[in-house]
Amino acid sequence: MQLFHLCLIISCSCPTVQASKLCLGWLRGMDIDTYKEFGASVELLSFLPSDFFPSIRDLLDTAFALHREALESPEHCSPHHTALRQAIVCWGELMNLATWVGSNLEDPASRELVVSYVNVNMGLKIRQLLWFHISCLTFGRETVLEYLVSVGVWIRTPQAYRPPNAPILSTLPETTVVRRRGRSPRRRTPSPRRRRSKSPRRRRSQSRESQC
């Protein structure tokens, strides 16, 4: 939406800019939130400060390192993979736009203003999108949503009544994984010990009972 408006401002005359503002107002009147289908919202993501999100370069490196095969696959893997593809393509187009502006816009002040807007405002939105979908693929959507809610509660709680440090996403799935892994060995380990302590005669009686 903002990219559409920005393109019109750069390439068109003043009357078209006014028309683009009308179109932008119409688009803003639509209740479109790209996070809704995943159980989140723009407002929920906005609780996280801008410096929380890694740089786009780091996020892209993470996405390609973990999910490159799925991202490049022609098949549909998951809604999160599809959203990642769209965000990556959108950022590539924004970079092309910034490069074009840097080469063709004569006024240095206007050129710097447009490039700064793309990097700061649109860059933050892309960073939020990339972080959200990479985190959902890495930790699970429910864990990420729980984390966003917990951070929102932590931020809204007065400083005197909250822990000194904000919740950390990486600690949530680790606790869950440890618990899940810890249950199965605990169930299996007592049985061999009991078998060793039992006499051979009792083992045979157990095997007969099992055959029946």
Swiss-Prot record:
Signal sequence residues: 1-19
Placement of Sequence repeats on the sequence: 184-189, 191-197, 199-205
InterPro entries: Hepatitis_B_virus_capsid_N, Hepatitis_core, Viral_capsid_core_dom_sf_HBV
Any one of the GO CC terms: extracellular region
Entry-linked Pfam families: Hep_core_N (PF08290), Hepatitis_core (PF00906)
Chain residues in the propeptide: 184-212
Molecular-function annotations in GO: DNA binding; RNA binding; structural molecule activity
Site (Cleavage): R183, S184
Region called Disordered, residue ranges: 172-212
Main subcellular location: secreted
Compartments, as annotated in UniProt: Secreted; Host nucleus
Single GO BP term: viral penetration into host nucleus
Biased composition (Basic residues): 178-205
Keywords for the protein's UniProt record, in alphabetical order: Disulfide bond, Host nucleus, Host-virus interaction, Repeat, Secreted, Signal, Viral immunoevasion
Protein modification: Phosphorylated.
Stretch list, region HBEAG: 25-27
Annotated spans, 3 X 7 AA repeats of S-P-R-R-R-R-S: 184-205
Alphabetical list of SUPFAM superfamilies matching this protein: Hepatitis B viral capsid (hbcag)
Record has DNA damage as a keyword: no
Family of this protein: Belongs to the orthohepadnavirus precore antigen family.
Subunit structure: Homodimerizes.
Record's function text: May regulate immune response to the intracellular capsid in acting as a T-cell tolerogen, by having an immunoregulatory effect which prevents destruction of infected cells by cytotoxic T-cells. This immune regulation may predispose to chronicity during perinatal infections and prevent severe liver injury during adult infections.
Name of protein: External core antigen
Source organism of the structure: Hepatitis B virus genotype C subtype adr (isolate Japan/Nishioka/1983) (HBV-C)
Lineage: Viruses, Riboviria, Pararnavirae, Artverviricota, Revtraviricetes
The gene coding this protein: C
